[in-house]
Amino acid sequence: MAYLKIVLVALMLVLAVSAMRRPDQQDQDISVAKRVACKCDDDGPDIRSATLTGTVDLGSCDEGWEKCASYYTVIADCCRRPRS
């Protein structure tokens, strides 16, 4: 019975916090592009001294971008714009 009370209180807190968000904040969160840098194969052997020229894209690379890392992940790829 104590676990049920804890779960109910936690759910009520989550509901209260989510209700306090302004509606315009939700629209802004969706439109913001979040990018994370990643290491391409030709950036160098050491991750500490490498310049991270790639960008993590969920799924596969966007149109006009190329995959720049040889390792394979199901969730995301390390991509960059093609060099001229």
UniProtKB/Swiss-Prot annotation:
The record's annotation in Pfam families points to: Toxin_4 (PF00706)
What is the disulfide pattern of this chain? 38-78, 40-68, 61-79
Q: Cite a single GO MF annotation.
A: toxin activity
Where does it live in the cell?
Secreted; Nematocyst
* Gene3D superfamilies the record matches: Anthopleurin-A
* Leader sequence residues: 1-19
Q: What this chain does, per the record?
A: Binds specifically to the voltage-gated sodium channel (Nav) and delays its inactivation.
Its protein name is: Delta-thalatoxin-Tas1a
